[in-house]
Amino acid sequence: MRRRDFARATSGAMFIAAALCTTAMADDVKRVSANGTELAYVEAGQGEPVIFVHGGLQDHRMWAAHLPKFAERYRAIAYSRRNHFPNDASPDGLPDGAADTHGEDLAAFVRALGLSKVRIVAHSSGAHAALFFATRHPDMLVSLALNEPPATGLLAGQPGVADTLKEWGSKQVPAREAAKAGDTQRAIPLFVDVVGGPGAYERRSDADKKMNSDNVASFQADATTKLPRPVFTCEMAKA
């Protein structure tokens, strides 16, 4: 598959990724030690490696519908990020938004698989992590396809951005407060409806809802962390 074809296939995949119905994968879940933790992954196909990075409240199952098609020409690999199912997970663990650490985990994951250069396809908070990976490890990257990275630092100084981000943050308060209180059954629908619009959670399949529930620990960690959220800047993008 040439670069243009890869970009076209990836673009189509990214636009429907968030609405996937997760399905069981034929490949067994494998595990590898990377950056001091154990990461679960699935893979299919042979050839040039493409690594798929999921977003928040998700895991490697997000990509289940896509891997078979990519596996026709690539070694398609989808892994679960630290503190996401089926890895060890805890509300006291790594927040979903810790993009810098997740980016280093990705680099360690690539090395643990014995790979040198990879293509990356990433969604949401996983895409934010992929930006840190790309900046810090450009020698490991062949191409980067991102969908909805919350890289708000790239908009710094633009007119109206501060007010927009403030409004966005205020919309997330109910979900985060519910997560802090341990009311995950309320927190998940609230957050999904903020991101996807009113009724987005109810429109999700039972499989997707289960995946969201399985990955609530990292969302709770995000809501309770005292650590500053990593910021990806224009200066970093230019480096």
Describe the function of each predicted region:
Residues 116-155:
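Conserved hydrolase catalytic core segment
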Residues 77-121, 125:
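Active-site loop/oxyanion-hole signature of alpha/beta-hydrolase fold enzymes
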Residues 153-208, 223-226:
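Helix-rich cap/lid subdomain of alpha/beta-hydrolase
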Residues 34-92, 109:
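Conserved HGGG/HGGXW glycine-rich cap/lid loop of the alpha/beta-hydrolase fold
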Residues 1-50, 73-74:
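Alpha/beta-hydrolase fold catalytic core
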Residues 207-239:
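Conserved serine/cysteine hydrolase catalytic core
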Residues 31-35, 58, 222-230:
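Short gly/ser/thr-rich secondary-structure transition/capping motifs
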